[in-house]
Amino acid sequence: MIEAITHGAEWFIGLFQKGGEVFVGMVTGILPLLISLLVIMNALIVFVGQRRIEKLAQKCAGNPVTRYLVLPFIGTFVFCNPMTHSLGKFLPEKYKPSYYAAASYSCHSMNGLFPHINPGELFVYLGIANGLTTLGVPLGPLAVSYLLVGLITNFFRGWVTDLTTSVFEKKMGIKLDKSVHL
């Protein structure tokens, strides 16, 4: 009986020790990276100018291809996951849900060619790549296919979310703004 209680107590404390290890890993790993990316993004906004960024966002927002294909690709390549989502703040309210849908998927689909984007989820691509390597199949076509299918899927995710947002606007009797107000 005492052994079971002791084992339970050790397990319980071990749970918090493991949580502490994860926390320390985040403090020394992802958090400094995110803070650095935030500083760089805000510095770029200051250097380029808030008005110019807003105008660029308006131009990107006017076209679904730039909104859900180009902007998520550039944002994900430059700012990685999860900072690419912050670019959505420059888009009008109407397109924010759709941008998030496209950008969140781009963090996964670009990993094959650009592993710096989302190293925490690289294991998905590497698992598939390991199977192909075992079969002696080259990985180049896989990485390119992963990217191209991802880009097309990103676009459709954004576009479909646009359509569902419009349905909910009508259903709720609201109209989301199509201009940027920061």
Swiss-Prot record:
Topology term for the membrane: Multi-pass membrane protein
Key word Transmembrane helix present: yes
GO cellular component: plasma membrane
Residue stretches making up the PTS EIIC type-5 domain: 1-182
PROSITE patterns linked: PTS_EIIC_TYPE_5 (PS51107)
Pfam family, one: EII-GUT
Induction, as annotated: Activated by sorbitol and repressed by glucose.
Compartment list: Cell inner membrane
InterPro entries membership: PTS_IID_sorb (IPR004699)
TM region(s), chain numbering: 29-49, 68-88, 132-152
Biological role: The phosphoenolpyruvate-dependent sugar phosphotransferase system (PTS), a major carbohydrate active transport system, catalyzes the phosphorylation of incoming sugar substrates concomitant with their translocation across the cell membrane. The enzyme II complex composed of SrlA, SrlB and SrlE is involved in glucitol/sorbitol transport.
Free-text note regarding domains: The EIIC domain forms the PTS system translocation channel and contains the specific substrate-binding site.
PANTHER family named among the record's database cross-references: PTS SYSTEM GLUCITOL/SORBITOL-SPECIFIC EIIC COMPONENT, PTS SYSTEM GLUCITOL_SORBITOL-SPECIFIC EIIC COMPONENT
The protein, known as: PTS system glucitol/sorbitol-specific EIIC component
